[in-house]
């Protein structure tokens, strides 16, 4: 809806950037599959190439796409990351910046172990991304302060943004 919308006589994305200095992103995932192996992959995204071309033409900067990890299952985490980075490559090829968002369930009893497996997997996949066309990461606040520093410093990462993922505002701010 927002992609085709307008404000003050301008297309929404251009208005957000030019008038409000808000960087426009487009949510492209179509929701989540049922949980399988402790994770929820993204549902298929029909018409992706056309959507990305339209977003680029309308002044969108990047995309957002979310998956969820609920258990420390290395095969499931790898499946989430494979899907996220495959989609990220398509977004990059369209001239947009993807926000890779593998959300970790904050109620997972093995959250810290999930984070360790997730970080390993992200670092491996980041090494396949050209630093000239970096990705962004949206990550659940980690159990250990500074845990994602290697990701923040990676040359193929434009920015890492925090995902509060169910924490109260006060708890998220404290983390």
Task: Give, region by region, the residue ranges found by the protein language model.
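Alpha-helical scaffolding segments of alpha/beta enzyme cores, especially the outer helices
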Residues: 11, 50, 79-93, 116-125, ...
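A structural motif
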Residues: 60, 93-96
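Conserved, mostly hydrophobic/aromatic
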Residues: 100
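Surface-exposed cleft-lining segments at the edges of enzyme active sites
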Residues: 35-40, 64-78, 105-112
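Alpha/beta catalytic barrel-like cores
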Residues: 1-61, 69-71, 122-124, 128, ...
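Short glycine/threonine-rich loop-to-helix capping motif typified by GTGT followed
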Residues: 77-78, 109-119, 143-154
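Intrinsically disordered, low-complexity polar/charged tails and linkers
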Residues: 138-140
